Amino acid sequence: MVDGRRFSEGGIMNYIQELQDVIRKLHGSFARHVETVPVVETFNGQTIWEGEVEVFDLHDHPKTDRVYAWRHETDNPASPRTVTVLHVPPITSPRKAVQASIVQAFREAEANAEG
């Protein structure tokens, strides 16, 4: 199970600022934090993802005015993974952003196993 709970050495404000920095680097837009949404995603009765998705408004982005972001631990505790997903249909909610991220991670794992 992936745990997408908030964490940062400097607390919640640093965590939000760190996500804003990643969003600016990846998407070239200033992001304003709007809210935190808890998400639990299950498959066949098992929880496969549980955490909090941060919702940001984007300014001057060519495709959307919203982005979802979170960080989760990896096999290497010193190297957490930051995920950002643009609010572009069919991604229209924090939950759908998590679902898209899970599908993408599954595809990447399959490709790595084949290659």
Where are these regions (language model features)?
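Negatively charged, low-complexity tracts enriched in Asp/Glu with abundant Ser/Thr
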Residues: 7-49
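Mixed-charge, Lys/Arg-enriched low-complexity segments
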Residues: 7, 78-115
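Extended hydrophobic/Leu-rich segments
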Residues: 19-26, 39, 67-70, 98, ...
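Acidic, low-complexity, intrinsically disordered interaction modules
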Residues: 35-92
